[in-house]
């Protein structure tokens, strides 16, 4: 009997998840179907309940429903509780298990696919939204020299740092970054989605080995263009993170971790 999974979000027409999970299933010999659901802003819980009633085994969750997915869970993981967001659900009888694989997907892409271990490195995170919340624990676990978070709303970043309470995690401002040096700079703001550049001083890239843009499929965004102009050798967008977090969810559901490299290669667009 074929198992059913789906991604839910709004809008959902842009999603790559059915393609990704279809490739995972084909290469790992798993019998499943994976669809896409345009969620209702007024009745997310009803959408999930209907999918479960039809025999659904699990769901990926994307914007704007990650908080609601977390709230719906009967058993959220530690990562989901910290992020106050879930990007994957698993249904086992009456139990609704929730996970957040965004951070571990980002970490795997940076360390495994891009060959940039974070241990002992100075890392700058631009933004303090859900993706950053999900990344903090996995990043801190590998022992960076420093993890610095900057957000337009400094109070939001400060509250998150206080919540984590880790000595390697600190909060700065865009103005205070002048003259600071980092090994890795990650843009997790929404600026690139609208073709804008976060107000980051150009010299933060002076010693950076990697500039990483969480948005994907946007080509050379203003953030990546600035990094390139400043001589950063390695540029990446978020397609690898997308595939790696999908692989984590697939393994959680199926007990088999699929190969990700062929899928990343298929989806990667030139950064030009």
Q: What residue spans do the PLM features occupy?
A:
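Phosphate-coordination loops involved in phosphoryl transfer and adenosine-cofactor binding
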Residues: 2, 119-122, 207-208
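Phosphate/diphosphate ligand-binding glycine-rich loop within oxidoreductases
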Residues: 2-114
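Glycine-rich adenosine-cofactor-binding loop
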Residues: 9, 100-103, 110, 114, ...
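Helix N-cap at the beta1-alpha1 junction of Rossmann-like dinucleotide-binding domains, i.e.
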Residues: 12-13, 154-155, 218
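Short glycine-rich anion-binding loops that position phosphate/pyrophosphate groups of nucleotides
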Residues: 62-66, 70, 129-131, 190-193, ...
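Adenosine-phosphate binding glycine-rich loop
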Residues: 120, 214-272
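NAD(P)-binding Rossmann-fold cofactor-contacting core
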Residues: 142-164
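Rossmann-like adenosine-cofactor binding region
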Residues: 166-235
């Amino acid at each position: 009997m074929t198992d059913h999974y789906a991604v839910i979000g709004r809008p959902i027409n842009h999603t790559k998840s059915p393609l990704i999970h279809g490739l995972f299933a084909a290469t790992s010999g798993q019998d499943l179907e994976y669809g896409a659901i345009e969620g209702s802003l007024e009745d997310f819980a009803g959408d999930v309940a209907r999918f479960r009633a039809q025999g659904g085994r699990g769901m990926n969750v994307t914007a704007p429903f990650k908080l609601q997915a977390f709230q719906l869970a009967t058993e959220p993981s530690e990562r989901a509780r910290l992020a106050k967001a879930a990007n994957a659900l698993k249904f086992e009888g009456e139990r609704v298990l929730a996970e957040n694989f965004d951070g571990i997907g980002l970490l795997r892409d940076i360390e495994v696919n891009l060959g940039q271990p974070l241990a002992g490195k100075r890392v700058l995170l631009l933004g303090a939204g859900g993706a950053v919340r999900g990344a903090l624990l996995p990043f801190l676990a590998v022992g960076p020299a420093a993890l610095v978070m900057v957000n337009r709303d400094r109070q939001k970043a400060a509250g998150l740092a206080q919540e984590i309470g880790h000595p390697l995690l600190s909060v700065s401002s865009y103005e205070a970054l002048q003259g600071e040096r980092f090994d890795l700079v990650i843009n997790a703001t929404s600026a690139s989605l609208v073709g804008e550049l976060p107000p980051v001083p150009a010299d933060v890239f002076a010693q950076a080995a990697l500039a990483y843009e969480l948005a994907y499929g946007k080509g050379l965004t203003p953030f990546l263009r600035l990094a390139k102009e400043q001589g950063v050798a390695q540029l990446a967008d978020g397609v690898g993170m997308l595939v790696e977090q999908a692989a984590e969810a697939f393994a959680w559901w199926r007990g088999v971790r699929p190969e990700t490299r062929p899928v990343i290669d298929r989806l990667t667009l030139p950064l030009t």
